[in-house]
């Protein structure tokens, strides 16, 4: 008991002598914990397998254009202050034919996002989406700025401007050797109850284009609109349309694009056993879409020219493991005249999320 009293007295003496140091240490630990909470990580491991068959491919009755890749993705988010956050996406892709696994990492996104009441701004390299037409026209990265204003819960307007590298170089003439171009768009959207609708205007600026009406202007324009109706919490129907322009090189392809899709439920990564399915009929066009959100769209020439039916389903095997399968059956509207234009495709994906 005497020893315990002596130890207690020694502890009290040391605590009094080093009280300032202990207090400062506590502050530093608290600051470190706060800083740690400022950065959060998420990501996935993804395996994709895709096969497209185009009967019109010269010299082949039926050719297979395959895609077999593994992806590792990291997505950090950082709190800057009460209004601003930072975001990034880093992808490391490995193709099946690259056994050395040295395809390398690529920073797909890096941007700052600010939120001030009803006003949102993104600056840097970020993902943009054509909300008006549910992704019929655009779903890819842009380096620039995007401003969104939502005056009410039902209405919002969005303006996007910057550089993008997803404008297919096959669509331009002259000395162009990359897919880069200047892109800007304005959109207005409405969502209330079971309904949503939108209207958008998109412009691509470049040196020259292969369209008859605009050969020396260096730009082309797309107007898109869409509407969606949710019959209940499980079933939703969407219809989207995009007006493009006439073209020279791909004159057999459609000028306009559209998509009609019926969705049932959908897999939830947090809910094992959840699933969803959809059926859609689409027509894509080289000058009416830029970087569509669908997995099927490019024909044998590498431009958006597929038309036909698409079905798909997804399923959550266990928490954070989701599988997807899709099938396309239709035709390639840009196929060589006189050749069979039949086109089919299969797409599968497994996501391991963390």
Predicted regions and their residues:
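Outer membrane beta-barrel
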Residues: 38-51, 61-201, 228-229, 254-293
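Outer-membrane beta-barrel pore domains
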Residues: 5, 9, 13, 29, ...
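N-terminal periplasmic/intermembrane-space "pro-region" immediately following the signal or transit peptide
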Residues: 1-46
């Amino acid at each position: 008991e005497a020893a315990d009293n002596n130890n207690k007295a020694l502890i009290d003496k040391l605590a009094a002598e080093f009280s300032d140091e202990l207090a400062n240490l506590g502050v530093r630990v608290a600051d470190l914990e706060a800083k740690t909470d400022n950065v959060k990580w998420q990501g996935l491991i993804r395996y994709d397998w895709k096969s497209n068959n185009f009967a019109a491919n010269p010299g082949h009755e039926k050719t297979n254009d395959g895609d077999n890749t593994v992806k590792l993705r990291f997505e950090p988010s950082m709190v800057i202050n009460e209004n601003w956050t930072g975001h990034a996406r880093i992808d490391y892709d490995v193709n099946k034919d690259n056994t050395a696994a040295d395809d390398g990492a690529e920073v797909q996104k890096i941007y700052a996002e600010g939120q001030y009441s009803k006003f949102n701004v993104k600056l840097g390299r970020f993902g943009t989406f054509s909300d008006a037409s549910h992704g019929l026209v655009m779903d890819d990265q842009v380096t620039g700025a995007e401003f969104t204003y939502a005056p009410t819960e039902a209405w919002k307007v969005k303006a996007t401007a910057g550089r993008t590298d997803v404008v297919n170089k096959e669509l331009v003439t002259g000395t162009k050797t990359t897919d880069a171009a200047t892109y800007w768009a304005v959109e207005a959207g409405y969502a209330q109850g079971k309904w949503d609708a939108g209207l958008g205007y998109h412009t691509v600026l470049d040196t020259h284009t292969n369209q008859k009406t605009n050969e020396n202007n260096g730009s082309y324009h797309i107007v898109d609109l869409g509407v969606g109706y949710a019959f209940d919490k499980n079933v939703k129907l969407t219809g989207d349309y995009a007006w493009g322009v006439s073209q020279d090189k791909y004159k057999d392809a459609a000028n306009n694009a559209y998509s009609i899709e019926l969705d049932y439920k959908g897999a939830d990564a947090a809910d094992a056993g959840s699933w969803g399915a959809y059926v859609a009929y689409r027509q894509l066009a080289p000058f009416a879409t830029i970087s569509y959100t669908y997995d099927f769209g490019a024909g044998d020439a590498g431009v958006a020219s597929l038309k036909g039916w698409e079905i798909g389903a997804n399923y959550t095997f266990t928490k954070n493991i989701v599988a997807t399968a899709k099938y396309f059956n239709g035709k390639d509207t840009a196929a060589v005249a006189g050749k069979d234009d039949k086109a089919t495709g299969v797409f599968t994906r497994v996501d391991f999320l963390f």
